[in-house]
Structure formats: structure tokens, C-alpha cells
Amino acid sequence: MGCLWGLALPLFFFCWEVGVSGSSAGPSTRRADTAMTTDDTEVPAMTLAPGHAALETQTLSAETSSRASTPAGPIPEAETRGAKRISPARETRSFTKTSPNFMVLIATSVETSAASGSPEGAGMTTVQTITGSDPREAIFDTLCTDDSSEEAKTLTMDILTLAHTSTEAKGLSSESSASSDSPHPVITPSRASESSASSDGPHPVITPSRASESSASSDGPHPVITPSRASESSASSDGPHPVITPSRASESSASSDGPHPVITPSRASESSASSDGPHPVITPSRASESSASSDGPHPVITPSRASESSASSDGPHPVITPSRASESSASSDGPHPVITPSRASESSASSDGLHPVITPSRASESSASSDGPHPVITPSRASESSASSDGPHPVITPSWSPGSDVTLLAEALVTVTNIEVINCSITEIETTTSSIPGASDTDLIPTEGVKASSTSDPPALPDSTEAKPHITEVTASAETLSTAGTTESAAPDATVGTPLPTNSATEREVTAPGATTLSGALVTVSRNPLEETSALSVETPSYVKVSGAAPVSIEAGSAVGKTTSFAGSSASSYSPSEAALKNFTPSETPTMDIATKGPFPTSRDPLPSVPPTTTNSSRGTNSTLAKITTSAKTTMKPPTATPTTARTRPTTDVSAGENGGFLLLRLSVASPEDLTDPRVAERLMQQLHRELHAHAPHFQVSLLRVRRG
């Protein structure tokens, strides 16, 4: 009985444990789904691939329960409800929308009018350039109307730059006066003005001017030099040193009583020279009347060109009188030559000393006097100036005028502009603005991606000048459009560089009143998503029409264009273009049905820096353009056909059965060749076979015998 109770109590406790365990495990058996815990985790992640992918991770938790009851020994009971883990693979998808091949024709019309003249001594030159419509409209109409899908939302125009260059110079023609009696130099720069300077010292008085009136006289032992242009000038010297008064487009006269030459160059004037000394009297002129007489033992040389000139010499040296469209007179009583060249000016020079009197002038009137032992130099251009020196140091009065000769001190304002197009909208970013001073005959700074404007201002006049302004304008503008290529959303690398340096040379004399230039750029861009590099071809046609008396020759190529005018102006432009586009299309590797979203980053190299380029102006620019055109032409010589006359006569009639038959022909051929030669006979049979094959394709021709008739 005690043993039964001893067995009954453990059994009772065992049943009790089983009942409790069954009550707790019953709902788990019936509703297993509710006891499981499911964690859905969405983890966005950036990958190194050229795209943006979302990584989704789903994790099902594992729950383990262990229950044990040991009635007599350990009876473990373990239940693992389930462990499930889903780790999808990482996937990267990139959508690339490639636009179809397109062609952009950019037509730009440039009209240039140039006029030159110098009314009332004040030079004026106007150059105006009118550029046609903005070619950006053609590009946007082509690129932004083809496709507006969701994948092609990001449209990037790598390079769409406008290089607009304008040069505008305004010169003020004024009258100014400056005087100095101090022993230190007085420098009075002016532009297109009238200036006067006086100096009584032993040092030179220098008064350069252009298109002005100048005169120079010297009583000291040093030269008095008075160069002028398009002016009237006079120079006299009583000292032992030369008085030099060059003139151009003026009338000049020079006399010398000393042992040194009196030189009076003139052009476009009438000139005469006389010499009583032992040295030559030289009077060059052009386009004038010339005559020369010599009583000395040396030759009298009188070159003239459509001119009148006179020269006389009583000394032992030659009298040389070249003339050019000028009137000049020179007399010399000393032992040295009297040289009187003149050019379209009036000048007079007299010398009583031992040194030459030289009176060059050019379209100006200048006066200079010096009483000291040092030279008085008075060059003038486009201004009226007078200079006298009484002190020991030089008085320098330079003046400039952009009217007669365009020589400008320019300051260029360079602005680099990058135009970026996103979703067919213009975003203009101004990056760099710099000021570049410089001096050139024609300042023109066209660079790719650069808007440059060059404005020449005259230097500041001193406080002691009185200015009467006369406005002279020089305006030149040019506009260049460069379209290199386009890239779209999934193009990581795109590098385009098109440097456009331009050299331009322009002279003063422009005889063509109007010029019309029609230039265009044909840009063809081919896009293929399966290729890595897309093709880019650029063609630039050019057409130039010049109205006026100046003949113009045009040589146009794909990279180098040369324009040469016989009117004294030459321009050469060098514009190489280099473009490279790289498109990279990543491969698609789908693993599971996971949606990939997000924009794709596009890597683009920055624009190459373009240094500003200043132009070099020179007269007679020699540009060599080597253009090689290879024409592949294949000339096929037809086979030598022997003129034959064949008569066909059927000799045997054979009825063709179901399987066909044969036809025996006898040909009588009249030929200058020997048909008994196997090669000639074979050629004849081939010709006959071709003729028969055109009518009946299934014919077979065989030659039995050739007999000479």
C-alpha cells in the first residue's frame, strides 16, 4: 500500500505537469502563426556601382522552447518552432535612356562694314560687325523636343559656350599745350591732340605727334629732328649738327649751307633739291615730277615714279632725286648731301651749319626750335604740336590718335561663362572675370567659352591741358559658338576640349566698304548605348562676299581658315577642335524582384581652363595651309573587244528531247587577230558565252575547231 502511494504521487505530479504543459502548449499548436515573430526590415544603402539601389532585408525570428519533466530520469523535450531568414542579394539596376542620332545645323551670318577716312585732318575708322540670330534656339529645338520621358529627365549639355568679343576704341582729339623751363624732363602724353613744348636747354626737345603740324629749327651744334606725318613741317639749322625734318604727304623744302647733308624726305609731294657742295643732294619722292641736273664729277641719279622732281648739284657728288607723289625742295651749299624725301606733306628745312638738316614729315604740321647743342626732335602724328627747348633736359610730348593709324593701348575684360542645360532650361554660371591690359594694333581676344570685350581708352591727360574733344570710334565685334556634344543621365565620363586661339592682323588701310560672311557649323552626334565612345563630327562651311574694290581670297578648311585681302589687311585664324565623349552603360544583373529607385549620379569632368589669347598684328601675315585631298578613283579598262562579224548558219537540226540537246554552230569571223592562237580563241569564246548567257542562262558553249578561211 505504501508502494502504491509511492508510485501514485509521482504519477499524480507527472500528470499535473503534463496538464499544465498541455494547457500552455495547446494554443501554440492551434495557432502557430500568432506566436511567430516576423521582422521586416528595409535598409536603404548606397552602392559603389554607378547607380542608386535599395537593399531590402527580411528576417524571420527563430523561437525555441524547451520543456522537460523527469519522472524517473531526465526526459528532455525540445521544440524548435522555426527559423527562417531571407537575405536577398544586392542588386543594382541602372536605366539609361539614349536619345536617337541627331544633327544640328548652326548657321551664323556675320555682316561687316568698314569705312576709313580722315575728314579735316581728324582720322576716323569705323568697323562694325553684325552677327545673326542666336544659334542656341536651334540646339534647344533639336534636343528638348524629342524625348521627355521619365528616364531622360536629366539632360546635361556639357559645353554650350558663346565667345563674344568686341573691341571698341574711342579717341578724343583735343588741343593741349604744355611748357617747361625746368632742367628736368616734362612728359605730356596726349592722344589726337595739339601740343606744344618749348625748351631752351642743351638737351633734346622731343615732341612726337601724328597727323599734326610741326616745325623745327636749330641753331645749336646738335640735330633738330622734326618727323611728322600728313603735315606741314619746316626745319632750319644754323649749327654744326643736323636738322632732321622728315615729312610724308606734305611739301618739303630743305636748304643747307654747311658741310653736312640737308635731308628732307617727302612722299606724295613735289620735290626739288640743289647742292653746291661736294656731297650729294638726294631728293627722293614718288608719284611726282622729277628732274635732276649735275655739274659735278659724280653721277646724277633721278629715279621717279609718276612724279615731278627737280634737283641741281654743283658739287663733285651725285644729286639723287627719287620722288613719290610729292613736292619737295632742298638746297645745299655745304660739302655734304642734301636729301629731301617727302611723302604727301609740306615740309621745309634749312641748315647753315656743318651737319645735315633732315625734315621728314607725315600728314602733319609740326614746329620745334632749339637753341642748345642737343637735338630737338619733333615727330608728330594726327595732332598739332610745337616744341621748343631752352633747358638742359628733354621735353617730351608724345601724342597718339587712333584715327590715322590704329595703335591702341587696350584693356581687355575677360569673363568665362559656362552655360549648363538641365531639363531644357538654361543655367548660366559666371565663373571668372579678369582684366588684362595690353597694347596691340588690333586687340581681339576670342577664346572658347570666353566673353571678352576690349576697350581702348586714351591715357589720362595732365591737369594743364585744355581739351577740345572730337570723337573717333573703332568698333569690332565677333561672336563664336562652339557646341561640342551632349551627354545624358547615365554618362559618367564626358571630357570635351575645344581650344580656339585666333590670330588676327588688321592694317589701317581698308578699301572694302562692306563684307558679308555666312558661316555655319554642322554638328553630327551619334549615340549608341552599346558602344563606349560616340562619334562627333563637325563641319564648318564658310562663305565670304566682299563688296568694294578690295579683292579677297578665301581658303577654308576644317581646322584652318585664311583670309587674305589685297587692300593691305590680312587675317588668319587657327581654330582646331578636339572632342572626346565617353559613355558607359552598366550591365543589368537581376536577382530577385526588387524595385530599384532613385536618381543616378553622373560624373563629369570640369571644363578645361582656356587661357586668354591676345592677337598678334602684323602686316603681310604669311600663313601656310597644307590641304591634302585624296581621291580614290578606280579606272576600269574595259576588255578589249575584237570587232567581229559573225554569221550563224545552222548546219544540223537536232530535235531536243526531254533532257535537252546540243546545237552545232559554224561561225565565220572577220578579225584582225589570229584566231588560231588559243588565247585569242579563248577570249572570243568567253565573249560569246557572255552574250549567250544574257539570253539563255543554261547554255554551254564549247569550241570544236578553228580553221583559217
UniProtKB/Swiss-Prot annotation:
Spell out the Polar residues composition-biased ranges. Answer: 57-69, 474-489
The annotated subunit structure for this chain is: Interacts with MET; oligomerization increases affinity for MET.
Q: In which tissues is it expressed?
A: Highly expressed in kidney, moderately in placenta, lung, prostate, liver, and digestive system. In the kidney, localized in the proximal tubules but not in the glomerulus or distal tubules. Detected in most of the male urogenital tract epithelia, with the exception of epididymis.
The question of whether Signal is a record keyword is answered with yes
State its role: May regulate MET signaling cascade. Seems to decrease hepatocyte growth factor (HGF)-induced transient MAPK activation. Blocks GRB2 recruitment to MET thus suppressing the GRB2-RAS pathway. Inhibits HGF-induced proliferation of MMP1 and MMP9 expression.
Any one Gene Ontology cellular component term annotated for this protein? apical plasma membrane
Q: Where is the composition biased (Low complexity)?
A: 173-182, 190-199, 209-218, 228-237, 247-256, 266-275, 285-294, 304-313, 323-332, 342-351, 361-370, 380-389, 613-652
Q: Could you say which residues form the signal peptide?
A: 1-25
State what protein this is by name: Mucin-20
The molecular function terms in GO held by this entry are: identical protein binding
- Which positions does UniProt annotate with glycan attachment? 423, 616, 622
